[in-house]
């Protein structure tokens, strides 16, 4: 798939970030608990990987880079899901990545736990808050 969306150096319209939820070959969701020492969302469960799109970088490249940095994994496939303008003028590119059967993940230092949650968000554990369930249903 070719991606045409890029952040141009010097553009002042707001920042561009990318977020990628991660699914395995069985459709399960990778959830990671953020470390307690982090300034944003400490000790909260989150889906996937994400970060800022660097100037000149495509969102697909950002997603692949973040998957490697946060989970030490390369996706078998990435699919674009949504482009969302946030209230703070940030634009969020949302994608979904699927891992090859048998792929192993290794969380980075910003995660203190991880789990594979069932394919159906209605079957997720109590640690999954309502915003996570709603977000998952948007891309499921």
What is the predicted role of each segment?
Residues 106-137:
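NUDIX/MutT-family hydrolases
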Residues 1-45, 51-65, 73-103, 122, ...:
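N-terminal leader/linker segments that precede catalytic domains of diphosphate-processing enzymes
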């Amino acid at each position: 798939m070719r991606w045409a969306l890029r952040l141009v150096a010097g553009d002042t319209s707001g920042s561009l970030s990318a977020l990628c939820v991660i699914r395995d070959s069985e459709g399960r969701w990778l959830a990671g608990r953020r470390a307690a020492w982090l300034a944003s969302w400490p000790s909260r469960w989150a889906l996937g990987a994400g970060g800022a799109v660097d100037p000149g970088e495509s969102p697909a490249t950002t997603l692949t880079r973040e998957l490697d940095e946060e989970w030490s994994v390369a996706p078998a496939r990435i699919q674009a899901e949504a482009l969302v303008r946030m209230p703070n003028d940030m634009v969020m590119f949302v994608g979904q990545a699927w891992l090859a059967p048998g792929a192993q993940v290794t969380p980075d230092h910003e995660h203190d736990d991880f789990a594979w949650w069932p394919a159906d968000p209605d079957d997720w554990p109590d640690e999954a808050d309502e915003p996570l369930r709603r977000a998952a249903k948007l891309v499921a």
